[in-house]
C-alpha cells in the first residue's frame, strides 16, 4: 500500500551487468537509528519518480532528436564546426523533485540551472520543438519552471577548471570555438531511477597550453535536496595545479560569503537577484571539502573563462574530489528570497 514501503532501486555501480547496490533515501535525526526490513518480492514495485536524467541527440540538422543514454564527441564535432546544435538542451540534464541542472556537452562543459515550480519531473520535450528540432524553449516560463541562470563564459554552478600560479585552464572551449581542446569526450547515463540518477563524463587528452590531462566526472542527484553531488578525478597532473570549482557571478551585486561550516565543509555562498534580467532571488552555494580548500579567487571579466568565483582545492593524480552544488530559487520556495533562510 506504500505506507510502510521505502522507495528504492537497484543499481549496477561497476557496470558489469549485475546489480550491486540497493539504494533508498531516509531521513534521520542526529544519532537516530531505524530498523529497516528487506523483503524479496516477485514483482518490483513502481514508485513515483523523484529523480531523472535525460539526453537527446539529432544525427543531422534535418533529422529529429532521439533519446539516448550515451555519447562520444570528438574535438571537431562542436556546433561551430558541424553547423548546428546536435544536443537537446545543449547536453544532458538531471533533476529531482526540487531542482534541475544541465551540462553543456557541446565543448563548454558548464553547468546550468533549471528552477522548478513543481515536484513532478519536467516534460521529455524540454529543448525540442514539435518538429523534433533542437530549440531553446526553456528560457521562458512553463508550468514546471524554466532555465533561470545566465552562464556566459563562466562554468556555471559547479563546473570546474584547473588553476596554477600563472594560468587558468578551461576544460573545453567557448561557444565561439570550432575545435575543442579535449580530443574525446564520453558521456553516459549510469543509472536513472525513482531515488537516484547518475551521469558519467570522461575527457581524454585534454590539452590546455601544452599540457595533457584526462578527467573522469560522476554527477549524482537524489530526492529532496536542492543540489547535486559531483566527483572529479584527474590524471596527468604535473604538481602545480589546483582544482577550481565555479560559482558564476554574472548578475551579482552582493558579495560572496565564505562559511566555515564544520570540520568537513567550507561553503561559498551567494544570494542575490542573480537570475536572468535579475528578476528573482536566487541563492547558490558550493560545499567543498575543508581539508582540500585553498581559498577562492575570481576569474577575469573577459576571456575563455570569466565572470565566476572559483573555489581552489588541492589535487593529486587519481584522487577523487567530492563537492556539492546547491541552489534555491524564490519561485520554488518563497522563503528562498530571505538570505538567512537560504544560508541556514
Name every feature range the model reports, one short phrase each.
Residues 142-222:
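Extended, loop-rich substrate-binding clefts of extracytoplasmic carbohydrate-active enzymes
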Residues 84, 90-178, 227:
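Extended polysaccharide-engagement surfaces of secreted carbohydrate-active enzymes
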Residues 1-21, 207, 251-267, 290-302:
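Solvent-exposed beta-strand/loop surfaces of large extracellular or lumenal domains
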Residues 3, 43-45, 94-95, 99-103, ...:
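Primarily extracytoplasmic ectodomains and periplasmic/lumenal surface modules that are beta-strand-rich
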Residues 215, 221, 226-260:
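Acidic (Asp/Glu-rich), glycine- and aromatic
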Residues 34-44, 199-203, 319-331:
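Short, hydrophobic/aromatic-enriched beta-strand segments in well-ordered soluble domains
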Residues 11-29, 285-344:
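Beta-strand-rich recognition/accessory modules
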Residues 1-67, 71-73, 77, 82, ...:
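Alpha-mannosidase-like glycoside hydrolase catalytic domains involved in N-glycan trimming
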